[in-house]
Amino acid sequence: MSPRASSATAHELSRSGLLSSLPGETLAKLAQRMTREDVPAGAAVVREGEDGDRFYVVLSGVLATTQESLGPRGLLRPGDTFGEVALAMDVPRTASVRALTPAVVASCDRATFDEFVRPLFAED
Protein backbone atom coordinates (compact mmCIF):
# COMPACT_ATOMS: atom_id res chain seq x y z
CA MET A 1 0.00 0.00 0.00
CA SER A 2 1.20 3.48 -0.65
CA PRO A 3 -0.01 6.43 1.42
CA ARG A 4 -0.96 9.54 -0.52
CA ALA A 5 -0.35 13.03 0.72
CA SER A 6 -4.04 13.86 0.64
CA SER A 7 -6.46 13.01 3.39
CA ALA A 8 -9.91 11.59 2.90
CA THR A 9 -12.78 14.00 2.36
CA ALA A 10 -15.75 14.42 4.66
CA HIS A 11 -18.02 13.55 1.72
CA GLU A 12 -16.21 10.24 1.18
CA LEU A 13 -16.46 9.37 4.87
CA SER A 14 -20.15 10.34 5.05
CA ARG A 15 -20.92 7.36 2.76
CA SER A 16 -19.99 5.05 5.63
CA GLY A 17 -22.99 3.85 7.60
CA LEU A 18 -20.92 3.90 10.79
CA LEU A 19 -19.70 7.48 10.32
CA SER A 20 -22.79 9.01 8.68
CA SER A 21 -24.23 10.12 12.04
CA LEU A 22 -21.25 12.39 12.75
CA PRO A 23 -21.94 16.13 12.34
CA GLY A 24 -20.34 17.69 9.25
CA GLU A 25 -17.71 19.63 11.20
CA THR A 26 -16.67 16.53 13.14
CA LEU A 27 -16.54 14.48 9.94
CA ALA A 28 -14.30 17.13 8.35
CA LYS A 29 -11.91 16.99 11.32
CA LEU A 30 -11.80 13.21 11.15
CA ALA A 31 -11.16 13.32 7.40
CA GLN A 32 -8.18 15.62 7.90
CA ARG A 33 -6.60 13.09 10.26
CA MET A 34 -7.11 10.08 8.01
CA THR A 35 -4.54 8.90 5.46
CA ARG A 36 -5.61 7.85 1.98
CA GLU A 37 -3.88 4.69 0.75
CA ASP A 38 -3.86 3.00 -2.66
CA VAL A 39 -4.12 -0.78 -2.42
CA PRO A 40 -3.20 -2.87 -5.49
CA ALA A 41 -5.37 -5.86 -6.38
CA GLY A 42 -4.20 -8.90 -4.42
CA ALA A 43 -2.49 -6.91 -1.65
CA ALA A 44 -3.27 -7.58 2.00
CA VAL A 45 -4.35 -4.59 4.06
CA VAL A 46 -4.49 -6.38 7.44
CA ARG A 47 -3.79 -9.94 8.52
CA GLU A 48 -5.65 -11.97 11.11
CA GLY A 49 -3.73 -12.17 14.38
CA GLU A 50 -1.74 -8.96 13.88
CA ASP A 51 -1.92 -6.15 16.41
CA GLY A 52 -4.69 -3.78 15.41
CA ASP A 53 -3.43 -0.23 15.29
CA ARG A 54 -5.53 1.37 12.53
CA PHE A 55 -9.20 1.81 11.55
CA TYR A 56 -10.14 1.72 7.85
CA VAL A 57 -12.89 3.03 5.57
CA VAL A 58 -13.18 1.67 2.03
CA LEU A 59 -13.31 4.57 -0.45
CA SER A 60 -13.21 2.57 -3.69
CA GLY A 61 -12.72 -0.97 -4.92
CA VAL A 62 -13.70 -4.34 -3.50
CA LEU A 63 -11.91 -6.13 -0.66
CA ALA A 64 -12.45 -9.61 0.77
CA THR A 65 -12.44 -10.62 4.42
CA THR A 66 -11.32 -14.08 5.51
CA GLN A 67 -10.84 -15.90 8.79
CA GLU A 68 -8.46 -18.85 9.10
CA SER A 69 -11.01 -21.05 10.86
CA LEU A 70 -14.05 -20.04 8.77
CA GLY A 71 -12.65 -19.13 5.33
CA PRO A 72 -14.20 -16.33 3.25
CA ARG A 73 -16.46 -14.06 5.31
CA GLY A 74 -17.65 -11.40 2.90
CA LEU A 75 -16.88 -8.47 0.68
CA LEU A 76 -16.19 -4.87 1.61
CA ARG A 77 -17.23 -2.05 -0.74
CA PRO A 78 -17.10 1.77 -0.62
CA GLY A 79 -18.49 3.02 2.68
CA ASP A 80 -17.70 -0.19 4.56
CA THR A 81 -15.31 -0.11 7.51
CA PHE A 82 -12.91 -2.59 9.08
CA GLY A 83 -10.40 -2.69 11.88
CA GLU A 84 -12.79 -1.40 14.53
CA VAL A 85 -13.05 -4.71 16.42
CA ALA A 86 -9.31 -4.88 17.17
CA LEU A 87 -9.25 -1.25 18.30
CA ALA A 88 -12.53 -1.20 20.24
CA MET A 89 -11.86 -4.48 22.07
CA ASP A 90 -8.04 -4.22 22.23
CA VAL A 91 -7.58 -7.67 20.66
CA PRO A 92 -5.51 -8.90 17.69
CA ARG A 93 -7.06 -8.63 14.22
CA THR A 94 -10.00 -11.04 13.94
CA ALA A 95 -9.85 -11.34 10.14
CA SER A 96 -7.62 -10.72 7.14
CA VAL A 97 -8.58 -8.19 4.47
CA ARG A 98 -7.20 -8.35 0.92
CA ALA A 99 -8.03 -6.22 -2.13
CA LEU A 100 -9.80 -8.08 -4.93
CA THR A 101 -9.61 -5.04 -7.22
CA PRO A 102 -7.44 -1.94 -7.06
CA ALA A 103 -8.81 -0.11 -4.04
CA VAL A 104 -8.44 3.06 -2.01
CA VAL A 105 -8.87 3.08 1.76
CA ALA A 106 -8.65 5.82 4.36
CA SER A 107 -7.19 4.93 7.74
CA CYS A 108 -6.54 6.51 11.10
CA ASP A 109 -4.52 5.61 14.16
CA ARG A 110 -5.82 4.46 17.54
CA ALA A 111 -5.87 7.95 19.09
CA THR A 112 -8.01 9.32 16.25
CA PHE A 113 -10.27 6.26 16.41
CA ASP A 114 -10.70 6.73 20.17
CA GLU A 115 -11.56 10.42 19.75
CA PHE A 116 -13.98 10.22 16.81
CA VAL A 117 -15.18 6.65 16.22
CA ARG A 118 -15.25 4.81 19.56
CA PRO A 119 -18.04 7.08 20.93
CA LEU A 120 -20.29 5.87 18.10
CA PHE A 121 -20.31 2.38 19.61
CA ALA A 122 -21.67 3.74 22.90
CA GLU A 123 -24.71 5.08 21.02
CA ASP A 124 -25.90 1.59 20.02
Question: Where do the PLM segments sit?
Answer:
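Cytosolic regulatory regions built on CNB/CRP/Popeye-like sensor folds
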Residues: M1-D124
